[in-house]
Amino acid sequence: MYVTFATCWYSLNSKFPADTYLHWMRHMLAEVTNYNLVLFTDAEGELLLRDHFAPYYFKNPHIKIVQKPIENWHNYQYKDSWIKNHAKNTLLNGKTEWKLNMLWAEKINFVNEARINQYFPETDFYGWCDIGYFREGPCPTFCNTPKILALNKNKIYYACVNPLQFTALKEIVQRKNEYGLPLVPIPPDQASIAGGFFIAHHSKIEGWRKMFDEKLRLYFQHNYLVKDDQIILVDCFLSEPQRFELRGSAGGSAPTPPSESSAKQSLENPWFEFRRFLG
């Protein structure tokens, strides 16, 4: 194996009902063959998963369930800041809860834990893959060895969903105040980088975790909005673009992530770029 992914399942007030995520989850769990998967959840979540899925899914030697209560997340230390942030997060606070926003920022910490604790023997690459990433069905060829070995070990890979926004965003991010934050805050409605998947060489994971965490704390310290993972991601990327490689370059406005019924749209949607690139 050359890659280990982290993912998670927690019962939170999310974008879709639980049954929808369980349907997508089946697509992922059915074809964990070319990579290792560490699935973080809590005690309630593990009971639900083992009740919903046949036992053979979790007999796969490449799948490891790890119980990690929300209170033990790295980002839980910022609980008060997350709650305060959610109160002013007008685009999302009527649809989701603050814990979901915290989860979006926890992804790199889950990946780093999978790397450090070595639930599987160390692999060359580590990454994050949303539990609902395979909406159109299983992908048995996902992350086969030649595709993983072709990755640049010096880059952190994400998907670009709207390149036309980057010129304006670059001007915003690079005009910083004395604290190192954008002088004019990043617009909360921008969507530029897909946070549902990333992959990087194991030597880049701790540095990326540290960069993300420092940026997040800076936003909280100065009461800047953290709408979801979008704002922190694009700030990090445009502050140090040499560390990243963005996949996908088709122009146009950012499409809305597809619903559970739009399989063809999912295959073509830049939010799911790595389903194609590594599939």
Regions found by a protein language model. Give the residues of each.
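Short, acidic, metal-binding catalytic loop of nucleotide-sugar glycosyltransferases
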Residues: 23-36, 55
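N-proximal low-complexity "stem/linker" segments adjacent to membrane-targeting elements
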Residues: 1-23
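Short beta-strand-to-loop element that shapes/binds the nucleotide-sugar donor at the catalytic cleft/hinge
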Residues: 157-170
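Catalytic core and acceptor-binding pocket of nucleotide-sugar-dependent glycosyltransferases
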Residues: 135-139, 179-279
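Active-site-proximal specificity loops/subdomain of glycosyltransferases
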Residues: 58-118
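Short, aromatic/basic amphipathic alpha-helical patches
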Residues: 46-61, 79-80, 172-173
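GT-A fold catalytic core of metal-dependent nucleotide-sugar glycosyltransferases
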Residues: 99, 104-160
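Well-ordered, non-membrane alpha-helical segments in soluble/globular domains
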Residues: 17-27, 108, 140-146, 231
